Amino acid sequence: MMEGLDDGPDFLSEEDRGLKAINVDLQSDAALQVDISDALSERDKVKFTVHTKSSLPNFKQNEFSVVRQHEEFIWLHDSFVENEDYAGYIIPPAPPRPDFDASREKLQKLGEGEGSMTKEEFTKMKQELEAEYLAIFKKTVAMHEVFLCRVAAHPILRKDLNFHVFLEYNQDLSVRGKNKKEKLEDFFKNMVKSADGVIVSGVKDVDDFFEHERTFLLEYHNRVKDASAKSDRMTRSHKSAADDYNRIGSSLYALGTQDSTDICKFFLKVSELFDKTRKIEARVSADEDLKLSDLLKYYLRESQAAKDLLYRRSRSLVDYENANKALDKARAKNKDVLQAETSQQLCCQKFEKISESAKQELIDFKTRRVAAFRKNLVELAELELKHAKGNLQLLQNCLAVLNGDT
């Protein structure tokens, strides 16, 4: 390619291209620090090396590492959800299952079509697909790390015995994925929960705070879901534009290498512009995916976890009201009064316990998400400005070269 278009290291450098953990503004302390220090992809499985540093007396050592798979993360998440003691807390959303099928399929198709393209085109596309695979891999690791960090930062969940076993037990936990029967059971449980949710949602809350939160979270969840879908379309559009620039640039380069005439030199210079513009457009897509799309996806899952908390509280409120009615009937009939009183007291205690912790959880959730969105949106705006300046610089340099000024 012809030299002359200086892309400027200030705009197109490769610094900070690594995918960092999705920012959720985690408030952790030095007493328990968890991270994923390494990860290894083996066919359809990813093995995560979970590294822990702790000064808590519950652990035998101050620093240790174990190897865990995705199914073990799901087991830990499900153990929190199924524990009645945690009914009043927002359970950190489980990380999504690793999925590299699309990237592997693209690499396979590229290998099959190697004979129909030039060596330069094949090398360039192979590098891009490998970079895409690596980005997905890093994102997968980040999502699993965020889950562990959220648990480690929680004042109650961090004390859970299963969590300590997950972090410290250096053998296989013998956790398997759910079979078809268990998946079917989960499906019916979700159907029953959805139907019950409709009944529970019709109950007027006795506390204005929770009534407001329920209305807000329903609207918030739907808005985030819509924004997430639109953000994905936006990043795909930028990626498609980058792919189009690549095809146009390759075609112009092929035309430019046909001869040494002025028009061929012109094609080579414009081809170089398209190649460098493609890189910027691809980075715009990657930045939007990391800073916005991933954040929206995370808070879509966390807002669902907050809705689940409110459902559990509403379910507890309905049980408490039903227990009050049952007690009134028992007293009227003067039958099984002691049993009804005991049941009513237990329901009351459960409802009050959930309400007390749920209020603080929802306040913390608001603080966390506002800080996360503020940080990511500011960073995204700064990156968008940087890329826009990079595009402007490239166009100015290209015009200068074409006009013969340099």
Swiss-Prot record:
- Topology of the protein relative to the lipid bilayer: Peripheral membrane protein
* PX domain location: 26-173
Cysteines joined through disulfide linkages:
none
SUPFAM superfamilies noted in UniProt: BAR/IMD domain-like, PX domain
Highest lineage ranks of the organism?
Eukaryota, Metazoa, Chordata, Craniata, Vertebrata
Q: What is its main location?
A: membrane
Record family assignment: Belongs to the sorting nexin family.
- The N-acetylmethionine modification is found at 1-2
Write out the ranges of the annotated region (Membrane-binding amphipathic helix). Answer: 182-199
Region named Interaction with PIM1: 2-179
Protein name per UniProt: Sorting nexin-6
User: Biological process (GO) annotations?
Assistant: intracellular protein transport; retrograde transport, endosome to Golgi
> Which keywords does the record carry?
Acetylation, Cytoplasm, Cytoplasmic vesicle, Endosome, Lipid-binding, Membrane, Nucleus, Phosphoprotein, Protein transport, Transport
